[in-house]
C-alpha cells in the first residue's frame, strides 16, 4: 500500500507550488536555450575594410545575406564568425536593405544597390575582393553541403591570396 500524505497545510501547498514553478521555469530555460547568434559587421566603408584585409595579406570577404536566410545563419555560425574572430576581415551586405555604405570608389550607396551592381541574386553569396575592389576568387553562391563548405571556403581564400 502507498502512504498518501494527509498534510494539506498552507505551508505544504506553498512548498509544492514553489517546486513546481521552479521546475517549470528551469525546464523552459533549458528547452528554449539557443546558442548565441553569430553576427558579422555590416559593411560601412569598403575602401577601409579592403585596406585592413590587404594589410593582413588576405582578400576582403563580403557576405551578401538576406534577413531570415537559414543558410546564411549557418554559414555565419559555423565558418565566418570563427574566421572573423581569428582576424579575417569579413563584412556583411544585406540584400534589400537601404543601409548606407561607401563603395570601392568612395561613393555613397546602399547595401541593396551594391547587391544589384554585383548581380547577386542568391543568398548567401561570398565575394572575395582584392586591390581596386576587383574580385580575386570565384564566388561562393548558395548553400553547400556542410562537410564541404569549409574546404571550398579555404580554396577560395587561397585563390584570393594568390591574386594579391
Residues of each region from the PLM?
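N-terminal secretory signal peptides
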Residues: 1-13, 17, 22-28
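N-terminal "domain-start" segment that seeds a small globular fold
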Residues: 29-50
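Short active-site neighborhood of thiol/selenol oxidoreductases, capturing the structured segment around
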Residues: 56-67
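Solvent-exposed loop/turn segments at secondary-structure junctions
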Residues: 67-71, 96-100, 133-134, 146
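Typically the conserved alpha-helix immediately C-terminal to a functionally engaged Cys/Sec
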Residues: 73-85
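Thiol-based oxidoreductase modules, predominantly thioredoxin-like and allied folds used
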Residues: 87-108
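Structural micro-motif
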Residues: 112, 116-127
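Non-catalytic, surface beta->alpha helical segment in thiol-disulfide oxidoreductase systems
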Residues: 128-161
Amino acid at each position: 500500500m502507498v502512504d498518501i500524505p494527509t498534510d494539506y497545510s498552507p505551508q505544504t501547498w506553498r512548498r509544492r507550488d514553489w517546486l513546481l514553478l521552479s521546475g517549470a521555469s528551469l525546464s523552459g530555460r533549458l528547452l528554449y536555450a539557443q546558442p548565441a547568434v553569430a553576427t558579422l559587421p555590416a559593411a560601412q566603408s569598403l575602401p577601409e575594410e579592403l585596406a585592413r584585409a590587404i594589410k593582413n595579406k588576405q582578400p576582403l570577404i563580403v557576405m551578401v545575406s538576406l534577413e531570415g536566410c537559414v543558410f546564411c545563419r549557418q554559414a555565419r555560425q559555423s565558418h565566418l564568425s570563427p574566421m572573423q574572430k581569428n582576424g579575417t576581415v569579413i563584412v556583411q551586405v544585406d540584400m534589400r536593405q537601404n543601409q548606407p555604405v561607401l563603395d570601392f570608389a568612395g561613393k555613397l550607396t546602399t547595401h541593396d544597390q551594391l547587391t544589384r551592381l554585383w548581380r547577386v541574386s542568391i543568398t548567401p553569396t561570398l565575394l572575395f575582393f582584392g586591390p581596386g575592389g576587383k574580385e580575386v576568387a570565384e564566388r561562393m553562391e548558395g548553400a553547400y553541403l556542410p562537410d564541404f563548405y569549409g574546404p571550398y571556403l579555404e580554396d577560395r581564400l587561397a585563390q584570393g591570396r594568390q591574386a594579391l
